[in-house]
Amino acid sequence: MSIFDRLKNVAEKTAKDAARSVGNTIGTKRETFTFSALPESLAEMQALPEAKLDTPFATAALTVLALCAYAADRATGTEMLNWLRGPRPLNGQDISFLNDRFRDGKTYLPFTYFAGSTPDNNYTPAQPYKVTIESNHVSAEEQGYMKLFIPCGGADSPRPIKLRQRGSDGKWFLWEQYLLTGVRTP
């Protein structure tokens, strides 16, 4: 094994140990975010305190709001999602996926993540709007990424969302979301 390979192995081990350490620090955590109203424009979203994008939990909560906006108005929702994705905007495949998920009147899907939203009440959330974001022991396994979970009123288990931290300023951006999968029909 060359000197370069040994140094590379040490660096990789150090990075993995650091990621595990962050994961152990994060552990199982729950954060609930409360919104008096849903933003109807990117400017309104950016005016929210969570818009600093300084925690993966805040970015995950804003993603739910952006998906609600997308259900109401695709252009506004796309603008919000692109902002949350940072330097990696939605591509044609992403937009096609979103459009497919909201087809056939399934605009209720993102509302299933708010407290009080159940199939019995047609996924009408309680107000103010509250969304809870959770982490667990595997959330920080991958360095620079955080996999969080959002409880859903229409499913038995929380749904995952993956966020990426930008190294230059520490901001958290949406990387992948699995929030628009099937739920119990209202």
Predicted regions and their residues:
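Surface-exposed, charged secondary-structure patches
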Residues: 96-153
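Glycine- and small hydrophobic-rich membrane-insertion segments that are intrinsically disordered
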Residues: 2-32
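Short beta-strand edge/turn micro-motifs at domain boundaries
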Residues: 151-186
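Core segments of small alpha/beta cavity-forming domains
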Residues: 24-115
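Large, modular interaction/toxin scaffolds in secreted and membrane-associated proteins
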Residues: 4-12, 72, 127, 139
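Amphipathic alpha-helical interaction segments
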Residues: 78, 91, 121-122, 131, ...
